[in-house]
Amino acid sequence: MRAVGALIVSKKTGRAMMQLRSSTESHSMCWGLWGGKLDGNEGDLEGLKRELCEELGYPGVPNTIAMSHVYTFTTRDKRFRHVSYLILCEDEFVPTIDHESAGYCWVNLGFWPKPLHQGAKSLLLSKSFRNKLDAMITHIRTKEDDSRSNTLSFYQAARASV
């Protein structure tokens, strides 16, 4: 089985949007990334776009600034593979959630809701993920001409407390 997921982060607030999985889904009532299983020969990005459209009610993430692959997990027997992405958008938005979600929340980075889906927990608490997030933020900052931007500056403080 192949699956994809994404953590969506608002540039304006520096918060991440998490999905509370429905009681009818596997890993029910756990917080996790947005995404799901790929269909047939669907590619990772194609599947992620479809899943986000289904789960968020939008044709993609509104006002996306950047997207980056952050991690690929494959089981030893290679029967399961999950590809994780980080999506940076301009601002928080309200999704129109579907039956796979019981809710959503925007949270400060490093202050993840509980209980976390085990796969999301492994990703979100990993140094590799934090490094990718830092790199994306730094890249966006260096491209900006507006020196007034403090986008996500609190992340270093939040990360230090994790």
Give short role names for the model-derived ranges:
Residues 1-17, 37, 86:
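Conserved N-terminal beta-strand and adjoining loop/helix that marks the start
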Residues 5, 30, 103:
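Conserved beta-strand and immediately adjacent loop positions that scaffold enzyme active sites
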Residues 20-24:
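Short, small-residue-rich loop/turn micro-motifs
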Residues 25-29:
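A conserved beta-turn-beta hairpin within the catalytic core of GNAT-like acetyltransferases
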Residues 30-36:
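Conserved acetyl-CoA binding element of GNAT-fold acetyltransferases
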Residues 36-64, 69-123, 157-161:
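Unchanged
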Residues 121-162:
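Charged phosphate-binding loop/patch that engages nucleotide di/tri-phosphates or the phosphate backbone
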